[in-house]
């Protein structure tokens, strides 16, 4: 009886959040993807999810083949949703292979039963959505002006609006997912993942909303923020100051980092070590933090695909009684 009462309470809270965010359910269009696609499991697409915070974008929801509406599922939210499942549909012919990795790990009973929510990026706004806003606000005037000038050159309205992007996920998308599908809603069953700038926003999400996200995976984290690794680039150090002030408790949160050694990833090593120092200072240990180097790996989806099983297992490891 208590379980039913809690579910009813949660249902009405979620509906209220959707109502408050002005996201009417009848304005959301969904459909199953073509079953002939090379996908392990099934994908339902939400076409241009409406939002008062960000530009509408597609959202792909992956379900395991044996999905059962009578069960409840953990949820993994992932950035760059159009790059996750099908290399035939991506701009560079690469993919993360999320469906294959999830299916294999679930079949081997290595993961909690989980659905994956792939949030597409809007390319022209990707940097603005993914760059941590409080980090930007803490930069000195010279750096902020330079970054805003960079955005204007690309015809972007602003360099950063990631606080609104997280509001979209937390107050619009997640409530919709939770009232539409049989999900477990606690932080311990809600994880977030991304790569490069998508790693930055995933890390920012667990810091800003520790009551929502219990775990984050950050692959090839773009610590330098832009494409400049000059000594005058203060972004990495402002990020670490932010982490020192805002990392969630390691008692009930865990964070995964990794990086390669080739192409853009070759720039990350010194900053990754600083991040590890920050987490260790905040009492993160081997149970709550991972930081892995993958020799020879480049900054690309095909390499994140190669190592994806590792962060998935860290975030979603099945609990054995």
What are these regions (language model features)?
Residues 22-321:
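Non-catalytic cap/lid and distal C-terminal segments of serine-dependent acyl enzymes
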Residues 9-16:
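Bacterial N-terminal signal peptides
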Residues 1-8:
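Bacterial N-terminal signal peptides that target proteins for export
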